[in-house]
Amino acid sequence: MRPPATPPDPTKEPGCKGTTRGLRKRGLPLTPEPGEGGGCSLEARGCEEESRQKQRMVTQASGREETEGDKLAKENGKITEAPSDDPQPGTDLVRKTSITSSESLQTVECSEFQNMAFLQSLDKEELGEGIKRRMRIKKCKSLENPPLEITKNEATQNIKVEFQDELFKNTPKHSCNSLSPGVEKNCSFELHDYSFLHSEGCNNENNFEDKPHDVCLHTEENSLKLKKENLRNLAEKDDTRTTTKLLKTEKSVIASKLLLEESHLYQNKNNGLTSCLQSEKNKYSVEENNTGRKHRKKMKSGKEEKNINLTLSNVCNNSVLVLQENQMGMEGKEAETLEPKKSFLKALRKINHNTLPPVDHLCLPKTVGKTSSRHHINAMLQKTLESSLKEDIKNTSESLGCKRIEPEKYNKSMISSTVKSPSDGHHMEKRSPRGDLRSETEESKVSCCRTIPMTGKRVWPFYSCARISAQCWKKTSLSDLNYSLLGPLENVRQHDSIIHQMNQTHLPDSKLLQPSLTERTTESSRKEMYDSDLSCLSSVSSVESTVMDIKEAMSHDKKTKLEEPSRNGAEVVSNATEDTQLSNITQSLTGNKKRKGNLSKLNLTVASQESQETNNCANKTVHRKVCITKQTLVAPDLVKILNTGRLTNFKIPLLKNKTGKRGAVSARSSEREAYSPLELLDSLSGVEAKQNRNKENICTTSGPQSLNLHSCIAPGQASSHSFYNKNSCTSSSFTKKGYDNKACNHISEPGNIISNKESISMKIENNTFSCDLGYIDQSSFCSKKQEAFVPISSEISGRKMTKSISELKLGFPDILKAYEDDVLLIDVIQDDPELFGISSEGDLSFASEVSKISQEPRVSEDQPTADFKHMHLPGKKEPGDLSKEVALLDPGLLKLESCPSLSAAKEPQHDPEGAAISLEATEETVVSGSLEGLSEQARASDSDAKCISSDKATVMEEQESTHEIFKSKDSRNVESATECQLATLGPNPLCSSALPVNLSSHQDVVSTPWINDVRFPGRHSVLQLQNPETCEIFKREKNMGVFQKPLGLLIPHRYCKLHFNTLRGCERAQCKFVHVPEQGDEKICMDVFRKYISVNEQRLLHRAAYIFLEYYRKFPPGIHFSLQVLNDLLISLLKHCLLKEVFQVVQLSIMAKMLPALKILLKIFEYVAAMKLRNAVPALIEIFCKFIEAGMVPDPEHLNYIVKLLHQAQASQQEISAVLQAKSRLRVRQLKKNWKCDLDSALSEVETCKEKSDWTKLGNLYISIKMSCEEFADLQRFCACVAETLTEDYKEERPGVPFCEFAETVSKDPQYSEVDKTLLGRIGISAVYFYHRLLLWAKGRKVLDILYELKIHFTSLKGLTGPEKEAPRCQIVNVAAEIFIKSGSLDGAIWVLRESEWIINTPLWPCDRMDVLNRHNLLCTIAHEILGKNLYKQTFEVLRNLPSFQNSQEMMGVSQSSLLFNELLDACIESNSLGISSSVAEFMVAKSIPIDFSFLRRLITSLGRSCLWLKARAHYKSALSLGCYPPLEGNLHRKLLLVPSYLSEIEMLLAMEIFLVSNASGIQSAGMGAPTQVLQIVLKRCEESKSRSKDEYQAAVERLVMAARISDPKLFIKHMTVNINKEQVYSLEHCSALKWLKENMKWAGKVWLFTNH
């Protein structure tokens, strides 16, 4: 035993991969890490030691078994490495179980090796018959008992107990090691790991299949021996001991099964299981590595080959037995009854009796090949697994319902995984101690390439004979084949395991993923599949046993096949017995050891893939697996071929013997069939083989559809498809994608599975794939309605099978040529592109078919089976990069991939869980070492994930996202996922590529590469060719168009034919040819556009948009431009949700004056509204406005519909208003179009209106003309015509005024503006003049009134016709004012004058003297009339604005104005309007208007009496200046004041104030003591007054006294004497005068002294 190596750190996984690969090359078996068994109990450890002892014995007994065990160990190691993140419910229990299983797996493995010889010696037929009976009984049970969960759980538990008891008895020492419950908890993860194990088992099985017949014999013999020994042991053992041992065995089985899974878990969590498992794993890893070197060296030694096969078979058997034991242990824990022992022995008999087909070899042969106790364990496990399978299926169905995995379900999952790679599980146990071996084993499982020098790793094509193990096809073929036998459940498990493996291989982080989560997901998917396969579970073993049995099971019970796949792992032995036909075919295929090994690997891979698909719910894997399984069913030889991933003695098969092994390789290649043409020739008739190939091609071609369909298809259906797809390698991987999504989604629907099985079974017998094809087509058409699958399948199959054999043959490279190429590539050219590519014919054939099918509708999947939270979504990539990268992987596939992907992308399909699963699978595949496969699968899974996250409304965005997923350069996950998928999908890259493009189907997203061992730098998933020479060759091949099918365009020589005439386009970094048509080649553009539109592929439409934009940005449209082509291009772009390109093309077309049809614009609006693309509304509105500006005139209905769509798209009010404004403009334009801007017709219409006196119609006509006329001059001309019409239509008998009706109609226009006011004003002036000339004051006034109402300032306008057109403003105002005056409206006249601002003659508005005179007279008339109405203020306003006062040069009419002013002043004084009187007096004084002094004196007196002393004094001073008062007589120093007697007291007082101020100095000096002077006041008698009586003079005396009294302060005067003239003389008292001066001198001095008198 090797010392246990420290468990590899997840981050060191790549290194482990390398070590594993090295070991594989050396053929060294990989030992499971003891850390996995860290949780084992003491009893389990004891059993482990016994297992080690038996293992040593078995190793000595059979090198072949060791080799096979190594392979299985490697697979187990890979499984052990499977990432286990996000543990799900029940994961702990499962993990514990898996740990226990790991230890018991070691023990069982040892026991198997020891008992290998014994098992071989057992009665082969007896054991096989018993097992077969067991399986059939189970089938019947499954059929009879639809609720298989309960029955299966019970039966499975019983079987587990019995099997465990028997197993314990048979291998008491070896199976004593029971893993701790922690291992059992990991069982579900182990199931995933088993999927990986199966993937790894592909390699192991390939090795085992080097001698599949021997393995089968040994298995049968071992099974018989084991069964007998078990029977004896059972008879001897007591129930209690049996129960205990069964529990132990169960733990061991669970541990082995979980150990596979625990390998991954170990990397993530369990680092302490390295002790026991490491030694055994190292042992098997060394053996497997030795075996790998034998394969690489092509050792032709029959002995070595035999040993390898034996070892492989032993390992497989050990793994299977261990897995079965683990499952049995789990089930045994649940059911400790001993009844299941019998059924288990029967299952062992069946297995021993029937030769296992390559699938069985992949699954059971490994177990059987182990011989001895392992064989017994396998037998017991198979029985137990049968019941367990039922229970597991039942549990799986429940788990799909988010329930915890039942032991039965779990056991079934484990059984399927174990069956596929039980020896792998054992292998893993041995490898587990050595993380390197384990990672290497995983890599070897996923990778078919040899170990390359340190400089780099080389990738070998799947079909290449140089491949020692099918990297992708290990998983794919193994999963598919196992799936065909085991059923969709197991295949799904295996596939999930593979996915985990892939994830683990590529991403150490993926290892962190909890196996429990993966297991739960797998369980849920598996449960769903079980639900769909409940009735099929009972017949799982028989189906697994042989293709024939499978067919029968399918025909009898469609569910049986589904059940069988799920139970396949556990019942491989029994299935081998029942599936005699399949086993026979497998044996025939096994005749070719190489192909047989490949087939086994492929089967294991397929099974694991399918299981993974189911678990992942990504139906992609399931689909691919299903396709592989179908292929296996149709041609068991193909199964062997697929399982020939690793052969001990690798030989280039001859034409005769290549049928088995080459077929598997061919199946891996996407172009070639699931099995090589040679294999087809051997296993099937030439025609049938070709038909199968054709069907395969069709299946591959319909891969994208199949993906969608498969997503909906139940596991059974997935199995059939997998088989069919395996026949068409591409379709298998492709279908794997499809199934992964849909199978998971519809696994729970057994009806679909049944229909699928039926079609499969029928076609299998006929070696036709119509069922598969039909199924695929059905799935693509009726994925949502599974019932329609069967009829559609027949039709589609018939359609596809109609292809001629020659056409089918085109899809496959020449066998002999491939043989030669393989030999050369293997031995001579390490980097020959032939290893990476497929013949151009095959590519073209598949491309054409795939493209056709891709165009067919796909059914989106919306039912996620499992939730993989731990999945890592790879980076996004653009579709262009994706196509290029895929092209690098496989140009032919790329074509197919591109077309289907585009078409698939058209139809959104959502399967988040499926996508997650595919991602998971991708990561695990990376762990396996299939980087390129991982990258591809990562792409697919990423695309799936993208589809998951994408909203349905944003399908277009989703498609772009999917494309972006592929384009993502820095997404390491994408690389790993892509590589993993490359490895997984193997020959199905075509379909895979197409799938990744399809957003809706996550399965579609996965693009299956055809290269396996390429590691990507982290930028692209594209294979990196390390050898420059190889790169050149590859580039040269691509440049030559070898991988691309021309589109049939006639392109000039200077143009790049790849760019214009191929789907994928030009991929040269620097192309010397033209990619955009040159000037003058517009016809070529149109031809290219028509072709691309007819092909209706998204990438071509992308390219068409690019060419359109590049060409018409440089050159204007010519004579060859076709607007219909532009419209069709836009419609096609819009159908593919390429809204961005639509906007770009439309904008450019508008700039180039190439307006698309209005319906295009409406469709864009409809799309934006339907998708609720709020962000696209602004750009769309901009395009709409450009449409309108460019001359498009949509109907009002269209505009209303656009507004409705904008509301639906939740556009803003501003955006909607933009459309409404455009609608208004369009209305104007429409009116203009209606009237045609025909002014003459409009004028004639005016005449019509005049004749009819329909002025309202004339107004409407004006509005129409206004909106239609583009030039204002034309509008003025029309208005002049209207003005003439309005003025000429004078009829006295008509009371109405035409202008008024016209103006009212125009003013009611909603768009009535200032322009309208101006035009109406000018028309109104013409009307005013007209009525003024006719002295029609009333009608003229009505015109002025309507102008006033409309607030039209006509005073600043001119008329449109006649003299008024040149009339000055003063004249217009005069006419209007005169009309108001004549009509009796002074207010109207004043309003007109005020409106004109009383302007008469200005530089801007010059006028002649006549107009001024007219104005003066008009104003005087108005003033006189107003003054008569006592409107003093208005009168003064009018008089003040007389022309003579505005311009100094105009002195006319002064005399007339003086009278008016004096009259006004008198009237104001009389009315006591002192304010206006004062203003008038001041204005008259200022303007030197002669004033009547009497009016002035009266005004002064009135002001004084009214105490308005300031104004009174001002006017008194003015009166003095004017000579109204006599000057002051005498010298002021004389101290004498002469006061006329006619003055009023106010006037006298004002005179006294002047006297005081004038003598102020003397008065004040007298107060200082100077001699006082007497101030005398003489009241003069006037001549006029002389004639008057004394009374008048005496009144004057009294006024003088009063004046002195009213003074403030009062003045005292004394009568002194009477002079000679009889005039009274008075003296002013000095004291009072002094006092007055003191108080009033300040203001009095200012008022009186500083004025000129």
Curated annotation (Swiss-Prot):
Restricted to testis, where it localizes to germ cells. Disulfide bonds: none annotated. Important for normal spermatogenesis and male fertility. Specifically required for progression to the post-meiotic stages of spermatocyte development. Seems to be necessary for normal expression levels of a number of testis-expressed gene transcripts, although its role in this process is unclear. It comes from Mus musculus. Disruption phenotype: Males are infertile, while female fertility is not affected. Testis size is significantly reduced with the phenotype apparent from postnatal day 28 (P28) onwards. Testicular histology appears to be normal before P28, but then cell aggregates begin to accumulate in the center of seminiferous tubules. Sperm development arrests at the post-meiotic round spermatid stage, associated with increased apoptosis. Adult testes completely lack round spermatids and spermatozoa. Its main location: cytoplasm. This is Protein TOPAZ1. Keywords: Cytoplasm, Differentiation, Spermatogenesis. Residues 63-78, 423-442 have a biased composition (Basic and acidic residues).
